[in-house]
Structures are given as structure tokens and as C-alpha cells.
């Protein structure tokens, strides 16, 4: 009997330690989750340099988050987010719906690459939309006994100081770089009572693609001045 009691105490201690580590080391969990599950959302490689998250304050920071380019495109990566600041309500970290007060993304660098009849960002956005749809279907199945995915409500998301490089295979690795207008999104998931992480990512990706398209169409003269010799026709092809 004593051996069983000792064994039970040891098991409880191990479980307790696991729960403690899981809660205290959210930074490790988030980094692994981004790099392991991220490719299933974006359809590309995902890498993150460093993650810092405090479960007590709810403040977090991601550095050097990189989204790879889809197959068939030549640029090294589609996007790099050097600095991402998070502010989460710590009381909701273990809740079914996590309340994110703010997300700030400073100085991202994005590559807008044309390939055939589409662009790399459109390919990534479609992958995110498809994953978001599957997540929604899985969430709706929760009433049938399937565990629901955690959802998020994001009060404010701000992307500022971004740069976009527009290129294509015809430009042989070179392109035209221009400023990305600031993007501000509010109340993501509020109307729906929360959205999954992939749904939130899809909303943000579509907002970025739309803003880039708007910027391209309103700055044709700027684009004509850049690139390599003979690249005007290639640049025209990017905005068709």
C-alpha cells in the first residue's frame, strides 16, 4: 500500500510540474506551436527567432517571425516580422476565449511576387482561408462531442512602418520597394464571439493583401522608376 501511495505522489508531482512548466514557459510552447503548426496554416515554412511571454502580465514579444515563400516563387521569404508586441488579458489565458487587448507589428518587410496568374501573398491567403474554414467546421462539430478549439477576440491590431518589395521572375531577384500604409484592425472576432487563430490570421493576411493592391494601383509612376533596365513591362505585369 505504501508503495502505491509513493507512486501516486510521484505521479501527481510529475503532473503538477508539467502543468507548472506549461503555464510558466508559454514562450517555448508558442515558439514550437508556430513552427510546427504554422506551415499547415500558411502552406509555407514558418520560423520564429525568439518568443517572450509572461503569463502573469499577459505581455509578450515575438522577434524575427518569418513566413516562407510558397513553392514556385523565387524570393527567399514572403514576409518577415522583426518585432511583434502582444498584450493579452492574463485572466483569459486558460479560458476558451482568449482576450487580446492589442497586437503591434513594427516595420515588417513583405515580398509581393508575381508568378503566373497569381501572387505569393494570394497563395498564402488562400491557404489561410482554407485552414480557417476547416477550423470553423471543426469548431461547429464541438456540439457533437469534439473538443472545441480555443478562440480569440482581438481589440486592436496595428501594423506600421512596413516595406513591400514587388518583384517577379522577370526581374531576376530585383524589384521595387515602397512603403506599406499603416493597417489598423479593431474588434477581430468580437461579433462572432471569438475566432480561431487561423481565422484571425486569415483576416490579417487579407487586409495586408488588400492594402498592398491599393498601394500598387495608386503608385504606378513610382513603380515605373524602379527595377532594372527593361523591367517596366514586368512591373506592368505585376499589377494586371
Protein language model regions, located:
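N-terminal type II signal-anchor transmembrane helix
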Residues: 1-43, 228-230, 237
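Short, functional N-terminal and low-complexity linear motifs
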Residues: 1-6, 50-55, 92-94
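A near-ubiquitous, low-amplitude feature marking generic local secondary-structure context
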Residues: 9-21, 31, 45, 67, ...
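Generic alpha-helical scaffold signal
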Residues: 28, 56-59, 75-80
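N-terminal leader/targeting pre-sequences
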Residues: 43-72, 160
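Secondary-structure transition motifs
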Residues: 64-187, 191-240
Amino acid at each position: 500500500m505504501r508503495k502505491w501511495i509513493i507512486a501516486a505522489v510521484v505521479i501527481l508531482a510529475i503532473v503538477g510540474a508539467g502543468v507548472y512548466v506549461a503555464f510558466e514557459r508559454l514562450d517555448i510552447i508558442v515558439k514550437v506551436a508556430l513552427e510546427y503548426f504554422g506551415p499547415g496554416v500558411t502552406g509555407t515554412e514558418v520560423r520564429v527567432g525568439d518568443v517572450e511571454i509572461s503569463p502573469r502580465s499577459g505581455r509578450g514579444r515575438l522577434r524575427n517571425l518569418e513566413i516562407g515563400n510558397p513553392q514556385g516563387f523565387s524570393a527567399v521569404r514572403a514576409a518577415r516580422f522583426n518585432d511583434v508586441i502582444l498584450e493579452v488579458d492574463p485572466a483569459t489565458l486558460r479560458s476558451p476565449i482568449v482576450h487580446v487587448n492589442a497586437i503591434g507589428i513594427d516595420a515588417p518587410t513583405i515580398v509581393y511576387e508575381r508568378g503566373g496568374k497569381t501572387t505569393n501573398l494570394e497563395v498564402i491567403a488562400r491557404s489561410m482561408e482554407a485552414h480557417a474554414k476547416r477550423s470553423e467546421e471543426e469548431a461547429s462539430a464541438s456540439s457533437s462531442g469534439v473538443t472545441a478549439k480555443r478562440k480569440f477576440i482581438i481589440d486592436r491590431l496595428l501594423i506600421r512602418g512596413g516595406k513591400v518589395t514587388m518583384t517577379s521572375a522577370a526581374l531576376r531577384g530585383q524589384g521595387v520597394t515602397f512603403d506599406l500604409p499603416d493597417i489598423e484592425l479593431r474588434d477581430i472576432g468580437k461579433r462572432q464571439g471569438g475566432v480561431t487563430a487561423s481565422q484571425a490570421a486569415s483576416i490579417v493576411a487579407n487586409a495586408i493583401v488588400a492594402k498592398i493592391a491599393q498601394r500598387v494601383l495608386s503608385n504606378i509612376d513610382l513603380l515605373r522608376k524602379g527595377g532594372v533596365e527593361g523591367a517596366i513591362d514586368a512591373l506592368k505585369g505585376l499589377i494586371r
